[in-house]
């Protein structure tokens, strides 16, 4: 069997040196490509290409308390800090930047596989009885049931 | 130096077959190395016992001359958002911190069946929402190419598959699985100096990949060479009855020509001009320019093309991401699996408290924003609008790949992957997650919009000694050509993925 040296190769692991690799490296460096030398007029634009669409003026986003409460209810997460609110507002501003793009007669692209028919399978049981396995993932169970606290009580806000 | 690290997967398994190497000793050393390199924080969980068990079984198969094929005994790592049976799968979130899936993702099952040895699960941004692998409950992942690991003076690995990229770059495994929704495989591949492939949408099954954005998510592959990438792709690709969004036509295993046999003279390369955006670094531009020139020198026709909706893409991506996140994250309520809060006042209260404790700020804000964009009064203005612009973006690609006039067509697009070398942690953390994603994903997310394949390959080192990479994109299901060209470039630039390891030694 080929002997694999037990020596470590990284500074965090060891302080020993590895001459052979350094040497190999040196040879390699000598014939490295010259990245400033070109043989053809380049097709790569050498200056930034300005975005072909204009930015709408930074419209100020205002969200009222009612909307925030609605969002918290729908999301079941709390908007708990001024910073979170600022991020929400700036994300909406960010989303507004495509508003002016002309999409007349352009259909929404829901999936890139739109030309493929979705495969349907027969309505038959194919997997085995995995009740025990699945229930094991839950924190609280009672016999063969998941357990939740009383329902139909509105979220305190 | 572990000499076998320099080998490709093909050479490694050849070593197993002729008995010069053993899967068990390779796995043992990999586990040992992973523990010595803990400072990188590439792994969130080691599957030590399982790995040794798998390696033993593999060694036995080789001894019996009935190996399972080209991945038998090859050490791999899997991003912690793929379900692995009996191995915890956390998405680096408190929400799933103690979740042990009862099943394997299809990708994991296929790797298991191919005999690959799973070393462990790798770090990511919580639920894969990020571009730095800095937003994880297990702490950030560090880049092996960092000049220093002190304080916050180290380089980020990129993300969100930063743990997978870091593990491959540090020689801890031969291949790692990542996921790619807007660049999450290619971005860390670019920063860590490894090959990162985002296959065509639907080529690899998403079954068991915990969903972020269903219409864009794909499993990704990270390796140290293009050939290794092909070996892994061949093992995991193909239709899956458990994922109705896989492409139904049978997968034909790729076989790349030898480098000397690659002829680029009939190849048409497009340079999409809009990919030169404001923040592009001089060194990346120089690299992009030089590789375009190399291709032209080899006889390929290289010309500039326009993908006019490129700049709009990042906004569309942000909208679709947040909308699908809002919907996908609704499943986490603490009842059936995952974290459950102690609040028993009411069902709604339990849900809310569970989610307040389980998600970080990034996830919460994306859910709230997504639900805002999906409100009845906003739905058309944001969500539907974004889907319409998404079609324009996809059509931009179709126009260059399928132009009616042959002289306007191109086969491959060449662009940067990231706009710079890997940033320092302190610089990266100075901007918010949302602002970072807008910069980091600029060149990568358009491919996810259109579902086309894209690969990032390392090209050279920057003056700071950090990897600089480029991206190639091609038309759907054109992986064969995409990776052939990638392999050709790889051979010209001779990037040494493991150089960082030697340098760490040399610098002391």
Curated annotation (Swiss-Prot), chain A:
It holds the Pfam family GatC. Its EC number is 6.3.5.-. It is found in: Mitochondrion. This protein may be expected to contain an N-terminal transit peptide but none has been predicted. Subunit of the heterotrimeric GatCAB amidotransferase (AdT) complex, composed of A, B and C subunits. Belongs to the GatC family. This is Glutamyl-tRNA(Gln) amidotransferase subunit C, mitochondrial.
């Amino acid at each position: 069997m080929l002997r694999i040296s037990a020596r470590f190769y990284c500074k965090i692991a060891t302080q020993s040196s590895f001459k052979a690799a350094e040497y190999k490296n040196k040879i390699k460096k000598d014939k490295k490509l010259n990245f400033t030398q070109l043989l053809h007029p380049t097709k790569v634009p050498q200056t930034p290409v300005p975005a072909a669409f204009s930015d709408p003026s930074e419209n100020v986003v205002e969200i009222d308390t009612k909307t925030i409460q609605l969002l918290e209810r729908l999301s079941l997460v709390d908007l708990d800090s001024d910073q979170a609110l600022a991020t929400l507002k700036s994300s909406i501003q960010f989303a507004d930047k495509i508003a002016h793009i002309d999409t007349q007669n352009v259909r929404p692209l829901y999936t890139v596989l739109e030309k493929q028919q979705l495969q349907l399978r027969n309505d038959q049981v194919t997997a085995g009885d995995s009740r025990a396995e699945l229930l094991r993932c839950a924190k609280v169970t009672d016999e063969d049931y998941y357990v939740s606290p009383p329902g139909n009580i509105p979220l305190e806000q | 130096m572990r000499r076998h690290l320099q080998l490709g997967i093909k050479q490694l398994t050849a070593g197993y077959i002729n008995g010069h190497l053993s899967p068990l000793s390779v796995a043992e050393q990999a586990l040992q190395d992973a523990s010595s390199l803990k400072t990188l924080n590439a792994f969130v969980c080691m599957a030590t016992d399982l790995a040794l068990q798998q390696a033993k079984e593999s060694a036995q198969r080789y001894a019996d001359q009935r190996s399972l094929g080209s991945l038998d005994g090859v050490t791999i790592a899997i991003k912690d958002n793929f379900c692995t049976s009996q191995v915890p799968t956390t998405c680096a979130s408190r929400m799933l911190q103690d979740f042990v899936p009862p099943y394997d993702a299809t990708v994991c099952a296929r790797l298991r069946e191919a005999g690959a040895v799973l070393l462990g699960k790798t770090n990511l941004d919580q639920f894969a929402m990020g571009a730095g692998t800095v937003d994880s409950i297990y702490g950030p992942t560090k880049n092996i190419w960092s000049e220093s690991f002190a304080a916050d003076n180290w380089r980020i690995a990129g993300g969100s598959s930063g743990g997978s990229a870091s593990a491959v770059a540090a020689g801890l495994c031969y291949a790692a699985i990542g996921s790619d929704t807007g660049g999450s495989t290619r971005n860390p591949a670019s920063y860590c100096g490894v090959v990162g492939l985002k296959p065509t949408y639907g080529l690899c099954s998403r079954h068991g990949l915990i969903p972020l954005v269903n219409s864009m998510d794909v499993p990704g592959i990270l390796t140290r060479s293009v050939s290794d990438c092909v070996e892994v792709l061949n093992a995991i690709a193909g239709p899956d009855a458990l994922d109705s969004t896989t492409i139904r036509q049978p997968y034909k295993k790729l076989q790349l020509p030898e480098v000397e046999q690659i002829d680029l003279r009939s190849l048409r390369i497009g340079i999409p001009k809009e990919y030169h955006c404001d923040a592009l670094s001089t060194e990346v531009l120089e690299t992009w320019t030089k590789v375009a020139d190399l291709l032209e020198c080899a006889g390929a026709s290289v010309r500039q093309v326009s993908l006019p909706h490129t700049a709009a893409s990042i906004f569309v991506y942000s909208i679709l991401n947040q909308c699908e996140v809002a919907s996908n994250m609704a499943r986490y309520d603490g009842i059936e699996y995952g974290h459950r809060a102690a609040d028993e006042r009411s069902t709604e209260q339990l849900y809310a408290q569970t989610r307040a404790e389980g998600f970080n700020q990034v996830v919460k804000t994306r859910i709230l924003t997504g639900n805002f964009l999906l409100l009845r009064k906003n739905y058309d203005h944001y969500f539907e609008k974004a889907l319409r612009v998404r079609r324009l973006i996809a059509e931009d690609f179709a126009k260059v790949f399928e132009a009616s006039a042959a002289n306007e067509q191109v086969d491959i697009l060449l662009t940067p992957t990231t706009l710079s070398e890997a940033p320092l942690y302190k610089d990266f953390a100075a901007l918010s997650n949302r602002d970072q994603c807008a910069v980091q994903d600029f060149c990568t997310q358009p491919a996810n919009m259109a579902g086309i394949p894209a690969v990032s390959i390392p090209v050279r080192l920057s003056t700071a000694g950090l990897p600089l990479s480029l991206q190639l994109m091609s038309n759907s299901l054109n992986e064969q050509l995409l990776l052939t060209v990638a392999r050709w470039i790889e051979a010209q630039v001779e990037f040494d993925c493991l150089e960082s390891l030697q340098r760490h030694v040399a610098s002391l």
